[in-house]
């Protein structure tokens, strides 16, 4: 009988340690994801450390050639539409307005890539000043204190619960780690995709009222993608400060408590470990919608 009790005790302890180890692997994945995020969160997409910008620049030049023709076309369309009544609308003041708009549009196309680089550098510097390491996930000793006070068959149920809890918690943390890295990397991809279309979009400003909506939509989209990383940095900063000093459930494992109470407390500790990860990931993945609603950038 003592042999069975010893076997049950060791088996339950092994399951608990396995759950703790698996949860620790999830925490290690989160830490690794945090290092990757810290490396790229303040990177300027136009810097040489990120591949693809040379291709984007070449495509911008190619689309600029198309935009020159479109600028002339939109200018003529806008002129004709706003000068139907020649006697009333065809004035010197309107002519100056048309040509000033045409010149500004042309300059925006020519120097647009430089302006884009300057804006991205500004946002990179701003983000670098805000960025902070992500909240850590630790599973050290999360299951100890309960199993040490149990023997025999009573170790099986909490051991199994701890194993399942560790696996589920690690899976949640792993998925969140992948999502938070994708949120940072997808921003670079979206910026690289829309930058070459800037000349074509900006050329619509030459047409004036009724035609410049395309250019306005491009600017709003670009600013949304650009400022998204600032919201991500703020979310990481706030989550680290908030969850780093707050105990959500106030759980405490003690030998004076029954194994049932301790088991519930340990499971709550797992939830307390996973909750900051979920909250941080939700804030990061929703950064784009937050910045669009905050600044009215919805197209």
Model-derived features: where do they sit?
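Alpha-helical transmembrane segments and their helix-start/interface "positive-inside/aromatic belt" motifs
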Residues: 7-19, 91-108, 215-228
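Hydrophobic transmembrane alpha-helix segments characteristic of membrane transport
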Residues: 70-104, 197-212
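Loop-to-transmembrane-helix entry motif
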Residues: 59-66, 102-106, 178, 185, ...
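Alpha-helical transmembrane segments
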Residues: 202-220, 290-297
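Non-cytosolic segments of integral membrane proteins
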Residues: 15, 19, 26-29, 33, ...
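Membrane-helix interfacial "entry" motifs
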Residues: 6, 50-61, 86-98, 158, ...
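Hydrophobic alpha-helical transmembrane segments
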Residues: 64-77, 168, 173
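Binding/recognition "hotspot" determinant
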Residues: 1-70
């Amino acid at each position: 009988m003592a042999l069975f009790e010893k076997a049950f005790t060791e088996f339950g302890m092994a399951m608990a340690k396995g759950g703790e180890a698996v949860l620790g692997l999830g925490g290690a994945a989160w830490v690794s994801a945090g290092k990757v995020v810290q490396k790229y969160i303040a990177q300027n997409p136009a810097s040489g450390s990120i591949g693809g910008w040379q291709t984007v620049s070449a495509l911008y030049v190619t689309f600029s050639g198309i935009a020159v023709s479109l600028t002339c076309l939109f200018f003529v369309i806008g002129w004709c539409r706003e000068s139907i009544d020649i006697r009333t609308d065809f004035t010197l003041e309107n002519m100056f307005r048309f040509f000033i708009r045409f010149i500004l549009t042309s300059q925006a196309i020519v120097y647009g890539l430089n302006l884009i680089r300057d804006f991205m550098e500004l946002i990179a510097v701003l983000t670098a000043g805000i960025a902070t390491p992500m909240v850590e996930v630790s599973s050290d000793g999360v299951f100890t204190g309960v199993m040490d006070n149990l023997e025999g068959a009573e170790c099986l149920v909490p051991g199994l619960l701890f194993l399942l809890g560790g696996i589920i918690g690690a899976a949640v943390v792993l998925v969140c780690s992948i999502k938070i890295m994708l949120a940072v990397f997808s921003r670079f991809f979206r910026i690289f995709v829309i930058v070459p279309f800037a000349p074509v979009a900006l050329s619509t400003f030459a047409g004036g009222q009724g035609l410049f909506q395309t250019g306005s939509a491009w600017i709003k989209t670009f600013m949304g993608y650009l400022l998204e990383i600032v919201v991500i940095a703020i979310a990481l900063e706030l989550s680290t400060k908030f969850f780093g000093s707050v105990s959500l459930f106030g759980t405490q494992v003690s030998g004076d408590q029954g194994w049932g109470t301790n088991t519930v407390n340990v499971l709550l500790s797992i939830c307390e470990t996973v909750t900051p990860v979920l909250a941080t990931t939700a804030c990061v993945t929703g950064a784009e919608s937050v910045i669009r609603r905050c600044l009215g950038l919805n197209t």
